[in-house]
Amino acid sequence: MADQRKSDVARGGGSLKFVILAFVGVGGLFGLNAMAYEAAYPMTAAGVCEIKTLPAGVLLEARSEGEYFRENNGLFRRLFEAIQKNQVPMTTPVEAGVRPGTMVFYLDPTSAKRTDLVLQGGVRRREVEERVVASIGIRGGYSKESFEENARKIREWIKTQPGWKPVGEPYVVYWNSPFMIWFLKRSEVHLPVHKG
């Protein structure tokens, strides 16, 4: 009887190890380890509004004539295909303009110097200079409603910051895979600003 219990415990422990390993594997597949990728700039904490400087960089950009929230899957697919085809390392975050719909992916420093990138499907390479944004950090699902609510909040917040003025339209910043569980997702809304 004691031998039977030991055998059951051993089998149970093995099952537990399998479940943990399976979860870790699924976590990797669905973006739970997204923060392991190289980040183009620091994340704004959830619920925080701040002004931050984004570095100059080289981007891959996909564009659409329609609004982003109608076209986002097509934009992500085109960018992902370009990343895979050119064997470019993944980075975070991905930025998305709303009207017209755009999605941009930051190239890592080594890939930014490459001259052999093959870009198709309307994906283009673009250089950006250092810029300043007002940012609000968000935790939760990626939706048009979340974007609109937080765009309103960051517009109201920047009015309380002496000397700072908006110089562009708000856009959304995604830190995690679209497949990540909604309540773990992190994002931001940025509003380009200038002091003067």
Functional labels for PLM-detected ranges:
Residues 2-196:
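A solvent-exposed interaction/effector surface
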